[in-house]
Amino acid sequence: MFTDIDTQMNTSHALGSATTIRSKSLNLDKAIAQAQAQLHALQHPDGYWLFELEADCTIPAEYIMMMHYIGEIDPILQSKIAVYLRAKQSADGSYPLFHGGAGDLSCSVKVYYALKLAGDDIHAPHMSRLRHYILSQGGAAKANVFTRIALAIFEQLPWRGVPYIPVEIMLFPKWFPFHLDKVSYWSRTVMVPLFILCTLEAKAKNPQQISILELFVLHPDKEKHYFPERTLLNKFFLILDKIGRVTRPLIPKKMHQLAIKKAEQWIVERLNGEDGLGGIFPAMVNAYEALLLLGYDKNHSYVKTAKQAIDKLLVVKDHEAYCQPCLSPVWDTGLTALALQEVDKIGNREVLTRAYRWLKSKQLTNEPGDWQLTRPELAGGGWAFQFANPHYPDVDDTAVVAFAMAESNLPDLTDSIQLASQWIVGMQSKNGGYGAFDVDNTYYYLNEIPFADHGALLDPPTVDVSARCAMLMAKMAKQHPDYLPALHRTIDYIRSEQEDNGSW
């Protein structure tokens, strides 16, 4: 039996707990209100949101290397990027691919070269630590393909140290084991200008003739193991690589010129104005350098526009600067709108109306796109990640934006939601899942080619993208029961991909 004192203590404890809960609730409400007000203030007058998209240090380093490739160096900008790069170094001297991650050899090599190009003394403590890390990982010869191509262009290693990727690949028929349509969109946009740069063996101007031979364990001319044999299939592709190099002189000149012209036309068709080839930095910078190598004057509209697209990615602050991998207004706007309407659909109506009006204007309904190669009869309806990237709408952005629209209960969005939902259902892969940009991009044997050591050649279905598509289809299935078969296939795919510990 409780005594009066026990009762008083229990009552006091309960009141204290309730007070704590109310206090936390008030703090949470205050935080939500402050975040909401800040998001209101950050909305562009046109209706979108755009936040900085910071990645690893590879791209800022590549921006410095690009300046030295063309021989046009902005010393103030270079100095600010160097400040940014130094600040991101890990304690062991390396540079990771994500905050707090393990060091990455390829990223570290590019940062070292960029800092040396920017004038850093190789005996400075940060450079010594970085060099020690690189050498401990086998040196620059063990960096990935993209890094070795950059080093070959800067004449730091021989061209035999990079895969044989002739521009004649542009002429391969679709049934051929390797074809552009069989790799991801980002691989396509990066590779086509690389075909030109590698086939013509581009040479950086490198006005100060900066070398990084100190990053090689063995002199690059003596190195014989640029391509470690990973599997039996990989060994077979390495043999084909050697055969291709030997037979290269046998390629007819007309065929060679035709292939270069086709690659050039492919790039020009997709230059995408000031939003750039593919809307991503690696493709943009390769296209910019390829156009110059093909003889385009630096004042040609294609070249000037390509450079402007690259420079739009810069984030320049008072004391530092970096280059983003791409811009993300559609993604940022979709997620922000979804968050705001979860807080208050009525109070945020004006803000949301502006956001969805802008998003409607960015929906891709009739534009030609690479996705149509596998779905020629499917009507458009997707969104791209960037301000403009009409050849490459993506399933992920489309699912998020359409879901947010459907949740908003705002008028005049029905047609956009319907087009997007139909497009999503039509972009389903055979296994029920969804890739980011393409259908059934599952030519896994291509991961064994020498060029694919970076592990991002393909665009196969993934659980996270598929889950967002399932959210949209589930939302729409009440009005469109014809979506249910696709939804069930997606759920089956997601379940099949669950990890042993229960996670995805």
Can you describe what each PLM-predicted range is?
Residues 1-504:
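Preference for long, amphipathic alpha-helical scaffolds in soluble/luminal domains
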